[in-house]
Amino acid sequence: TDFTVCASDFDESTVTADTPAELVEMLARGKCRAVSAQHPGAVVIGCDTVVDVKGEVFGKPHSVEDARRMLRALSGAVHEVHTGVCISDGTRTESFVDTCRVKFFPISEAEIERYAATEEPYDKAGAYAIQGRAALWLDRIEGDYYTIMGLPVSRTIRLLERF
């Protein structure tokens, strides 16, 4: 099956929510709606991911210092990764949120500095790529690994099959 990846022009700054899970679902729905409007009749999947550290939402870091701050907060701690997925065919829209709990080993300041000096953390929620160098910090996961990567594949496929 052919597919096209498109960036959404949805303004994420307009969205507020009571919980991180509500936030990612609203963001996924907004992105999906924006792309659906540009591609009538297409089946569109919109996604968004945030990291939740004790109620503080970490999106993508805006600077090196922001990445360092996030990584220090994640060091040795349990956090949750929430990914919202929305699918629409233009007439029907469905969405869900998948949540995964992640625990990192303690991360040394030297490791944080080395990692923040790479390109890897800057386009990832929570400033880390679980499939990259950050895999070295992983103590345990409760939930779907692919939720951490930004698309809970098995749940997404199950929903997509209904369209």
What are these regions (language model features)?
Residues T1-C6, R162-F163:
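N-terminal G-site helix/loop of the GST-like fold
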Residues A17-F163:
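Anionic-ligand binding patches
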